[in-house]
Amino acid sequence: LECHNQQSSQTPTTQTCPGETNCYKKQWSDHRGSRTERGCGCPTVKPGIKLKCCTTDRCNK
């Protein structure tokens, strides 16, 4: 599986995720504004954080 792994509005980059079946995209706000994190897997998140998990290559744009 290949997932995007750039933070927020950085130039898109990807990583290969051996053995993983999910990519994720987390979004939240802090004192610097809206934040986005992407990567392999499907992590558990705290309340107030939006999480989208998906199962195809580069699906977490």
Curated annotation (Swiss-Prot):
Expression (tissue specificity): Expressed by the venom gland.
Keywords carried by this UniProt record: Acetylcholine receptor inhibiting toxin, Disulfide bond, Ion channel impairing toxin, Neurotoxin, Postsynaptic neurotoxin, Secreted, Toxin
Gene3D superfamilies reported for this sequence: CD59
InterPro entries for this protein: Snake_3FTx, Snake_toxin-like_sf, Snake_toxin_con_site, Toxin_cobra-type
Zinc-finger found in the keyword field: no
Keyword Disulfide bond: yes
GO molecular function annotation: acetylcholine receptor inhibitor activity; ion channel regulator activity; toxin activity
UniProt GO cellular component terms: extracellular region
Transmembrane regions listed in the UniProt entry: none
Disulfide pattern: C3-C23, C17-C40, C42-C53, C54-C59
Location relative to the cell: Secreted
Major subcellular site: secreted
PROSITE patterns given in the database record: SNAKE_TOXIN (PS00272)
Annotated CDD domains: TFP_snake_toxin
Domain of life: Eukaryota
Function field: Binds to muscle nicotinic acetylcholine receptor (nAChR) and inhibit acetylcholine from binding to the receptor, thereby impairing neuromuscular transmission.
Assigned protein family: Belongs to the three-finger toxin family. Short-chain subfamily. Type I alpha-neurotoxin sub-subfamily.
Protein name according to UniProt: Short neurotoxin 2
Record organism: Hemachatus haemachatus (Rinkhals)
